[in-house]
Amino acid sequence: MQLKGKTVLITGGASGIGLESAKQFLANGASVIITGRNQEKLDEAMRLYPAITAIKSDVSDAGDAQKLFNQVQQLGGIDILYNNAGVLTDPINLGTANGQHFEDAAYEMNVNYLGVIRLNNLFMDMLKSRKESAIINTTSLLSYVPSLLEATYAASKVALQFYTKSLRKHLQILNSSVKIFELLPPLVATEMTTDMNGKKMTTADMVKAFIAGLEKDQLTIRIGDTKTVYILNRLFPKMTFGLINPKKSYKVIAS
């Protein structure tokens, strides 16, 4: 996919992977609109990269999503919708009665899954009207293997993965040219993963590999350890589960 001359909307674009993506999309000749919930972070992003357009919006809020669409439409529309926004709640034992289970799961599903569907639906006709356009949905290495510490987060990413595959096929049935990409990052060094142990890829390296996949029209973009986990889980699912869920994670859940 050609990025030069395209306009990209990045959700969760004020920090981490989203902000690094904005930087590299700009370097590849694209125009970039970012959105997020924190105005201070959006302002800082615009200070760092003055070419960025920033719009405060919460993807999990229907009213905000509609306002975002209206503003983007007034700016001339987009060619690429990059659903990057995601949230992760603290580990909690699902085997104990606790009202927090539902609240956390609902929060993660609203942002990580339902928010994506909402934006895709709002922008679909706009994207269909473009000569070359795309939707990028961000799932996870954990959409292949359950995680005890991120149980409902992983579940939200599995839901998004299945939705993404179906959306791609539905558009093919309609003979639509809108490309549907699934991005599967490994563990990346961001604010969200600060308290996580394990080898972390830098945002710069992750986004570089991501953009390389986009330019090659690689519809499923597995990066770094995600490639290894994908293959291992197909061959040795029990062993792979153990790698993702070491015994020390049991102690966290039991505490």
Over which residues does each language-model region extend?
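Residue(s) in the substrate-gating loop at a strand-loop-helix junction
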Residues: 140
